[in-house]
From Swiss-Prot:
Its EC number is 3.2.1.21. It comes from Escherichia coli (strain K12). The lineage of its organism: Bacteria, Pseudomonadati, Pseudomonadota, Gammaproteobacteria, Enterobacterales. The gene is bglX. Pfam families: Fn3-like (PF14310), Glyco_hydro_3 (PF00933), Glyco_hydro_3_C (PF01915). This is Periplasmic beta-glucosidase. Gene3D superfamilies: Glycoside hydrolase family 3 C-terminal domain, Glycoside hydrolase, family 3, N-terminal domain, Immunoglobulins.
């Protein structure tokens, strides 16, 4: 595959602007060589040049290219983001080499979360694959395309554990579970960075948003987070540490406050934990405008105070504000910030530039100028095959009454819904340099699959929403949602007439991509009413009804679950989304995705997640009792639990077999089950292993995911799946904030989702 190509592209530095003889060369990419090099470089730098390295600016209206040129000339820029073509990146690096005194290279960054030009499923969809090979594919292709555009760093992966679907940025992460998020994040870092971020087709990652951003109160963007240290370190911190242990070179610091202190000014978080406890050596980057926001947080009196607090707390690079360059010179002069503190921040920035290989070749990710693509958006630059394969694995079959799916290609199919033919929405949030016109919609995918065999009819049926306030919000900066001027009833009538002419109705419904994005928190997580009215009208036709969901968060679907004959969760599936969805609808691919977040029955249940603590009065549905932990107007559990997902075949899981009834601290126990495909077609499923610490010094979750394996079985085939359990799987942060495992009984649960499991047990001695 072209994205795995390891052939280097020779870059003749003689073709580039003249370089400083003593700065660039064949420097060994070792910590020792780096430290010596950076120490000498710092000695040559002025205060202003050191401060300039701490400035990360975005290309845009506030910073036009002409203004950036002057900043570069004066050594006032350390890195650039939001520029994504080789031509633009080359021009800026040329300016550094031609105009600046020391010629310290820029690095270039972008939000490449689920693809650069080829857009893969959103991270929440990727998590649904429960397949680390799929994560590796996304990471390698994304890095290849980003590096091929000249980028050196991505603001990814996002590893914020989120248990509140009201939060719009849940779409960017890997879901509610600590273990799954840690595993996915670690794998993404390794895939994107490859052997070294200095490699031609690798990029440096930036784990974000540190810390606990996914736990904002009320699921409201930019809100505060308040939690015990035990919950913080047991549930929310492990994914960040996993990404850093995998070698991530950067951390983006969160916008929220944590237990009363904004993360941007939290020296305990950024120094005591990140540097001292975890040994992180890379750079910390503030989120967009976060330093100036310390004033509004109420922890800085004025801009100068905000800069002082941020730098002393451990923020190395300032994103998208001029505060460091404007106020640090005076703070240094007055002694409120020491030269040692400035040098420490600048050293971290220079270190990552060295690790990127920029002091060996500042054009390392650009290649020779003559290799620049004539058309930066050329079809030949896409990786459609990989995108389609990964997208298929991300799809989750939620319901399939009477085997409504797969559909017959010879049928007359009505494709209905405001998202059925939306090229933009299928790509989802943070679609990087992806081009909407290159994406495949569900309507197009179905037409491609049917060909001349059957007939495909189409009606839009409804607007995404009829709420003018929401439309205005979504279209605040551009026309992201196109509104059909027809009346709602006129559109529904057309859809009903289309449905009546068909054998089956496929309704593509859910959210526009802007509804599941940064700054897109919702209090109502149902499908918008305009679409619910459409679904009701389609149901009334009596035709088999298949709902294809397009969304970036779990939705409350109690009514739709009752109405639909089949429901396929597709998230935002990316460039090849339409073809991948059609593959599943027609049975060319057997769905195998599993939910990485629980789907609540209503917003009133939130947060609903599988790994909750027990109570002194737990609810038992088999033995109802008024005085137990429950709602009297709603069921306790999720509509669709974590790890849930159906297939076109069926599987059985045997009883759990333990290799031993007891385990020593330096030993291990292996838990095994036999999984059998009891259906009539080949299929894959995810075997999931959960643990429960039955009695401990503090209340522990009712179960926690500690292992998973995706297996493919032919009809009638049986496979033994085994999970080794060691002491690390049993440890937790206790009331004394000691990380350890406690002796006693442990339950082992193994199944194909978090609710349907077989149980075993062992004792830790």
């Amino acid at each position: 595959m072209k994205w795995l190509c390891s052939v280097g592209i020779a870059v003749s530095l003689a073709l580039q602007p003249a370089l400083a003889d003593d700065l660039f060369g064949n420097h060994p990419l070792t910590p020792e060589a780096r430290d010596a090099f950076v120490t000498e470089l710092l000695k040559k730098m002025t205060v202003d040049e050191k401060i300039g390295q701490l400035r990360l600016i975005s290309v845009g209206p506030d910073n036009p290219k002409e203004a950036i040129r002057e900043m570069i000339k004066d050594g006032q820029v350390g890195a650039i983001f939001n520029t994504v073509t080789r031509q633009d990146i080359r021009a800026m690096q040329d300016q550094v080499m031609e105009l600046s005194r020391l010629k310290i290279p820029l690095f270039f960054a972008y939000d490449v979360l689920h693809g650069q030009r080829t857009v893969f499923p959103i991270s929440l969809g990727l998590a649904s694959s429960f397949n680390l090979d799929a994560v590796k594919t996304v990471g390698r292709v994304s890095a290849y395309e980003a590096a091929d555009d000249g980028l050196n760093m991505t603001w990814a992966p996002m590893v914020d554990v989120s248990r509140d679907p009201r939060w719009g940025r849940a779409s960017e992460g890997f879901g509610e579970d600590t273990y799954l998020t840690s595993t996915m994040g670690k794998t993404m870092v390794e895939a994107m960075q490859g052997k070294s971020p200095a490699d031609r087709y690798s990029v440096m990652t930036s784990v974000k948003h540190f810390a606990a951003y996914g736990a904002v109160e009320g699921g409201k963007e930019y809100n505060t987070v308040d939690m015990s240290p035990q919950r913080l370190f047991n549930d929310y911190m492990p994914p960040y540490k996993a990404g850093l242990d995998a070698g991530s070179g950067a951390v983006m610091v969160a916008l929220n406050s944590l237990n009363g202190t904004p993360a941007t000014s939290d020296s305990w978080l950024l120094k005591d934990v990140l540097r001292d406890q975890w040994g992180f050596k890379g750079i910390t980057v503030s989120d967009h405008g976060a330093i100036k926001e310390l004033i509004k947080h109420g922890t800085a009196a004025d801009p100068e105070d905000a800069v002082r607090v941020a730098l002393k707390s451990g923020i190395n690079m300032s994103m998208s504000d001029e505060y460091y360059s404007k106020y640090l010179p005076g703070l240094i002069k007055s002694g409120k910030v020491t030269m040692a503190e400035l040098d420490d921040a600048a050293r971290h920035v220079l270190n990552v530039k060295y690790d990127m290989g920029l002091f060996n070749d500042p054009y390392s990710h650009l290649g020779p100028k003559e290799s620049d693509p004539v058309d930066t958006n050329a079809e030949s630059r896409l990786h459609r095959k990989e995108a389609r394969e990964v997208a298929r694995e991300s799809l989750v079959l939620l319901k399939n009454r009477l085997e409504t799916l797969p559909l017959k290609k010879s049928a007359t199919i009505a494709v209905v819904g405001p998202l059925a033919d939306s090229k933009r929405d299928v790509m989802g949030s943070w679609s990087a340099a992806g081009v909407a016109d290159q994406s495949v919609t569900v309507l197009t995918g179905i037409k491609n699959a049917v060909g001349e065999n059957g007939k495909v009819l189409y009606a839009k049926g409804a607007n995404v929403t009829s709420d003018k306030g929401i439309i205005d919000f979504l279209n605040q900066y551009e026309e992201a949602v196109k509104v059909d001027p027809r009346s709602p009833q006129e559109m529904i009538d057309e859809a009903v007439q289309t449905a009546k002419q068909s054998d089956v109705v496929v309704a593509v419904v859910g959210e526009a991509q802007g509804m599941a994005h940064e700054a897109s928190s919702r209090t109502d997580i149902t499908i918008p009413q305009s679409q619910r009215d459409l679904i009701a009208a389609l149901k009334a036709t009596g035709k088999p009804l298949v709902l294809v969901l397009m969304n970036g968060r779990p939705l409350a679907l109690v009514k739709e679950d009752q109405q639909a004959d089949a429901i396929l969760e597709t998230w935002f599936a990316g460039t090849e989304g339409g073809n991948a969805i059609a593959d599943v609808l027609f049975g060319d691919y057997n769905p195998s995705g599993k939910l990485p977040m629980s789907f609540p029955r209503s917003v009133g249940q939130i947060p609903v997640y599988y790994s909750h603590l027990n109570t002194g009065r737990p609810y038992n549905a088999d033995k109802p009792n008024k005085y137990t932990s429950r709602y009297f107007d709603e069921a306790n559990g999720a509509l669709y639990p974590f790890g849930y997902g159906l297939s076109y075949t069926t599987f059985t899981v045997s009883d759990v077999k333990l290799s031993a009834p007891t385990m020593k601290r330096d030993g291990k126990v292996t838990a095994s089950v036999q999984v059998t495909n009891t259906g009539k077609r080949e299929g894959a499923t995810v075997v999931q292993m959960y643990l429960q610490d039955v009695t401990a010094s503090m209340s522990r979750p009712v179960k926690q995911l500690k292992g998973f394996e995706k297996i493919t079985l032919k009809p009638g085939e049986t496979q033994t799946v085994s999970f080794p359990i060691d002491i690390e799987a049993l440890k937790f942060w206790n009331q004394q904030m000691k990380y350890d495992a406690e002796p006693g009984k442990f339950n082992v649960f193994i199944g194909t989702d978090s609710a349907r499991v077989k149980k075993g047990e062992f004792e830790l001695l």
